[in-house]
A protein has these predicted regions:
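Phosphate-binding P-loop
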Residues: 21-27
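Short phosphate-coordinating micro-motif centered on Lys-Gly-acidic
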Residues: 3, 49, 87-90, 95-154
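Short hydrophobic/aromatic beta-strand immediately N-terminal to the Walker A/P-loop
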Residues: 29-31
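N-terminal pre-Walker A segment at the start of P-loop NTPase domains
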Residues: 1-19
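Short beta-strand-centered segment that lines the nucleotide-binding/catalytic pocket of NTP-utilizing
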Residues: 53-68
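P-loop (Walker A) phosphate-binding loop of NTP-binding proteins
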Residues: 33-35
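Conserved lysine of the Walker
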Residues: 40
């Protein structure tokens, strides 16, 4: 199942993230696809806000990962593998994290760890358009991610 959403501004991208975050209960995996500057971390900032995380989300480009505590014993694990050619130990860590029912896992530049992502991964490709709007293509990999996409499209 693939759906498409157009956002006009960074604020709309954050608001979409807020809505997405409000739908997440833990155990979900989201792969963000897009060029540098497309808005992957911006979307994640909104997602964190929607999960009830007050802490400011920062890009994990140089740290590879950041974890944020959310209400109701949930967590947001945000990964950015842009700088990795080989996942190494991060692949083993990620394999554990995506199995945690309390953790929402968001991964940027996931190609290097793609074989550990669950089948039921929500893939969101963010494409910058000529007029600087963003076209988001949402692909649901399974039942849970399909439900999330259906709720987002309402």
């Amino acid at each position: 199942m693939t759906s498409e959403i157009i956002v006009q501004t960074a604020e709309e991208l954050i608001e979409l993230g807020v809505t997405l975050g409000s739908l997440l209960r833990g155990g979900e995996t989201i792969e963000l696809i897009g060029d540098i500057g497309a808005g992957k971390t911006t979307l994640t900032k909104g997602l964190a806000r929607g999960m009830g995380i007050a802490e400011e989300v920062q890009s994990p480009t140089f740290t590879l990962s950041r974890v944020y505590d959310a209400p109701n014993r949930r967590r947001l694990a945000h990964y950015d593998f842009y700088r990795l050619n080989n996942a190494g130990i991060m692949q083993a860590e990620l394999a554990e994290v995506v199995q945690d029912a309390r953790t929402v896992t968001v991964i940027e530049w996931a190609a290097v760890v793609g074989d550990v992502l669950p089948d039921d991964t929500l893939r969101i490709a963010i494409r910058v358009q000529a007029d600087d709007t963003r076209r988001l293509e949402l692909e649901a990999g399974g039942k849970c991610s399909k439900h999330i996409v259906q709720e987002l499209m309402k």
